[in-house]
């Protein structure tokens, strides 16, 4: 089985790259689409906790399995359970929504060997407590605290939200060699390496609630400072 994070090579794809589940809601929905114009597929959905353990004790994906005809669309609802009241109320909790596409069985009358690959899409699902309410246009990601020592950046997240840093480069033309996306949990700290680049000027990009990449400039001449880059 092949697991991918965005479903880019899958016949059946979700309509987003992340889900924010507000605790005041009973459920949240996403749309899935069978992009094949020839074959029907089954779509098998489930939820995993932060450790990657399958569980429906807190959140349930419904229906767990459904059939999509060629070029058809459908919905998956993620429904909260009563036990979600046990989740922390002062910070987000991370889950994963998983969807595995199941192709139709090959034609047994064919003389040709057929390799079937079950592709699995996996996207982040953030449970957001009722006490956490972002104001319109609020950019909590700019509260990220950064310090530099040589070719290492320390990223400290003082907020109650998960911060996903998906871009780090000298400019907007490409990431630093070897850089991989970093997710900083609420009230935690992680380190990332800048490789052979030891300068103090960076472009740093984070993912917003809708999965869009938002760019900032990072100036570490003295104390590191983040500043949003206005969209062109």
PLM feature spans:
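A mid-sequence, solvent-exposed acidic-amphipathic segment
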Residues: 136-172
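Buried hydrophobic-core signal for structured, non-transmembrane domains
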Residues: 28-34, 78, 95-100, 152-157
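Terminal connector regions
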Residues: 83-132, 136, 199-232
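N-terminal signal peptide c-region/cleavage motif recognized by signal peptidases
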Residues: 5-7
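Beta-sheet-dominated interaction scaffolds and their linkers
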Residues: 10-33, 134-148
């Amino acid at each position: 089985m092949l697991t991918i994070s965005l479903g880019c090579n899958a016949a059946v794809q979700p309509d987003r790259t992340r889900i924010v589940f507000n605790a005041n809601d009973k459920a949240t929905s996403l749309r899935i689409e069978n992009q094949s114009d020839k074959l029907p597929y089954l779509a098998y959905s489930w939820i995993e906790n932060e450790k990657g353990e399958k569980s429906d004790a807190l959140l349930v994906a419904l229906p767990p399995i459904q059939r999509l005809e060629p070029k058809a669309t459908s919905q998956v609802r993620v429904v909260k359970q009563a036990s979600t009241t046990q989740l922390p109320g002062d910070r987000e909790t991370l889950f994963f929504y998983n969807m595995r596409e199941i192709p139709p069985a090959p034609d047994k009358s064919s003389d040709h060997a057929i390799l079937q690959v079950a592709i699995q899409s996996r996207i982040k699902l953030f449970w957001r407590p009722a006490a956490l309410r972002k104001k319109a246009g609020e950019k909590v990601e700019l509260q990220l605290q950064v310090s530099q020592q040589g070719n290492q950046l320390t990223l400290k997240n003082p907020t109650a939200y998960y911060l996903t840093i998906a871009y780090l480069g000298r400019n907007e033309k490409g990431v630093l060699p070897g850089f991989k996306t970093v997710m900083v949990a609420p009230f935690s700290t992680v380190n990332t390496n800048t490789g052979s680049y030891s300068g103090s000027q960076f472009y740093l990009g984070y993912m917003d609630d809708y999965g869009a990449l938002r760019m900032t400039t990072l100036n570490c001449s003295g104390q590191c400072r983040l500043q949003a880059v206005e969209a062109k």
